[in-house]
């Protein structure tokens, strides 16, 4: 494993290895055990999309690992002014030990890895969100013990979250059901991948997706860069709000996850959100531990 570009690239064993390491690093963090696996290492962080959780979790994480971060905002770097990605990749590779990028186009992440000579981590693209899904899987395993026999459902937009959850969930052996309106489905590449698994369901009915689910997941209906579509999306997703009715179709001990920020009253009700604040904020914390595991896996000598 040289990079984390998308979960499609990883085997089940590689995903489980990252989760096991994340569990270990979380334990050590909670018990004050230092783990400077990346002492003196530098992570360049490129942000072409604004961020709270991604920036803080990566910066805190690399510091806890004994390294440090250099932050490049899109408008404050040459990559944001039109410098070819291949040139940025080759220059940064001379300065730093790893690159994390949060951007729009998946191709930009792939090109950084292609032309650079240091590990590249996808902090988010419009196509996928691998770090978030590793945190989600870590949280699911914490609450449920294992992935065996579990059903995970995602209700909402066929966006980067849904794409990565389908891939990650199926690869670790869960049944995966997703509900989204016509016109907001995952891309064909993801559906072609899912077609190779027996435990996948695609529907436009949230109640069908949620039936007997152990984990119910949602995300915002309007992602960054889609603000002009808000009114149309709110109309299309009417009936897709995670409420008590939808939760009633899931198992009685089902947990809810949301990658945040949440728009309460849109994709999830205030009541369901607060009833599941424990797993939701554990999920947010686990971004730190999962990403530390990714950095150690990729950047440790």
State the predicted function of each range.
Residues 42-43, 47-95:
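Active-site cofactor/substrate anionic-group-binding motifs, chiefly glycine-
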Residues 92, 112, 208-209:
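Structural alpha-helical scaffold elements that stabilize or flank donor/cofactor-binding regions
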Residues 48-60, 143-218:
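Glycine-rich phosphate/diphosphate-binding loop of Rossmann-like nucleotide-binding domains
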Residues 97-168, 258:
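Anion-binding alpha/beta catalytic cores of soluble intermediary-metabolism enzymes, centered on
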Residues 1-56, 60:
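Positively charged, low-complexity intrinsically disordered leader regions
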Residues 253-254, 260-301:
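Adenosine-phosphate binding glycine-rich loop
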Residues 195-271:
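Rossmann-like adenosine-cofactor binding region
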């Amino acid at each position: 494993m040289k990079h984390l570009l998308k979960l499609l690239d990883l085997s089940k064993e590689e995903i489980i290895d990252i989760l096991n390491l994340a569990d270990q690093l979380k334990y050590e963090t909670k018990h004050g055990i230092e783990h400077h696996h990346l002492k003196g290492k530098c992570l360049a962080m490129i942000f072409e999309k604004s961020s709270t959780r991604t920036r803080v979790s990566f910066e805190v994480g690399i510091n806890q690992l004994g390294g440090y971060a250099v932050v490049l905002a899109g408008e404050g770097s040459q990559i944001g002014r039109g410098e070819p990605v291949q040139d940025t990749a080759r220059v940064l590779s001379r300065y730093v030990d790893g690159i994390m990028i949060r951007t729009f186009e998946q191709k930009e992440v792939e090109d950084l890895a292609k032309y650079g000579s240091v590990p590249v981590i996808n902090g988010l693209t419009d196509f996928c969100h691998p770090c978030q899904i590793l945190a989600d899987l870590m949280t699911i395993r914490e609450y449920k013990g294992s992935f065996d026999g579990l059903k995970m459902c995602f209700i909402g937009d066929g966006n980067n979250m849904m794409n990565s959850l389908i891939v990650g969930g199926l690869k670790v052996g869960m049944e995966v059901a997703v509900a989204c309106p016509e016109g907001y489905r995952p891309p064909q590449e993801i559906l072609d991948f899912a077609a190779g698994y027996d435990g996948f369901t695609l529907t436009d009915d949230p109640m069908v997706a949620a039936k007997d689910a152990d984990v119910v997941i949602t995300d915002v209906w309007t992602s960054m860069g889609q603000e002009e579509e808000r009114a149309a999306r709110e109309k299309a997703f009417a009936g897709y709000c995670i409420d008590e009715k939808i939760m009633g179709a899931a198992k009685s001990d089902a947990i809810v996850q949301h990658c945040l920020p949440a728009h309460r009253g849109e994709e999830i009700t205030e009541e369901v959100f607060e009833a599941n604040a424990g797993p939701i904020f554990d999920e947010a914390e686990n971004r730190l531990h999962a990403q530390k595991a990714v950095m150690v896996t990729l950047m440790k000598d």
